[in-house]
From Swiss-Prot:
Name under which the protein is recorded: Acireductone dioxygenase 1
Binding site for Ni(2+): H102, H104, E108, H146
Name of encoding gene: mtnD1
UniProt-listed InterPro entries: ARD, ARD_bac, RmlC-like_jellyroll, RmlC_Cupin_sf
EC number(s) given by UniProt: 1.13.11.54, 1.13.11.53
Pathway membership: Amino-acid biosynthesis; L-methionine biosynthesis via salvage pathway; L-methionine from S-methyl-5-thio-alpha-D-ribose 1-phosphate: step 5/6
Cofactor dependency: Fe(2+); Ni(2+)
Signal peptide: none
Upper classification of the organism: Bacteria, Bacillati, Actinomycetota, Actinomycetes, Mycobacteriales
Amino acid sequence: MTLVQVMAQDDRDQVVLRTADRTEIADTLRPFGIQLDRWPLRELPADAGQDAVLAAYRAEVDEVCRAGGYRFVDVVRLVPAPEDPEWPARAAAARGRFLDEHRHTEHEVRFFVEGRGCFYLHLGDKVYALVCEAGDLVSVPAGTTHWFDMGAQPHFCAIRFFEREDGWIGDFTGSPIASTMPTLDELVG
C-alpha cells in the first residue's frame, strides 16, 4: 500500500499525517516538487531481467526520459534468496548503502515494478516517509535531503532514471536523523 507518514524531525511519535489516499499524498508532496504517479503494471516472469523489464515499460520509460532529459536507465532487483547463504549479508549491505541521509545533484526518479520501499524526505522541520509499492513512479528533486529503506528482507524491482552514467552519487549530510525514524518494516507492520 502506498502511504505517507509525516513526522516531526525531532520526535518520530509526533505524527502530523498518515494517509494512504493517493490524492492527499500527491497534494502533500507537490509543494516540495515531489511527484508521485501511477503506471499500470505489466505481467512479467518473477525472474525478468533488465531487458524484459525495460521492454515491458518501453513507452513509459521513453516518455520519462524525453520529458526529464534522462539518458541512462537501469533496473535494480533485490529479492529474497533463502537458498543463498550470502543473501543476508548482501541484503544488509545493500540496505545500509542508502540508509543515511543524503542528497543528489540530479533528480532521483524510480518506478517500482514489484515490491516496495520507503523514501524518507527531510523537508523543513518534518520527515515525510513515503512508502512506494509496485506501480508507483516517484520523482524527488535534486538537492532534497532524503534516505531510502528497502526493509530488513528487501523485495523490490525498480527502474532507475539518470541524467549521467554516474548519476547515483550521494552527498551525505552526516546527520543521524535516519536512525531516529521508524523503519519501513515498522511503518507497514
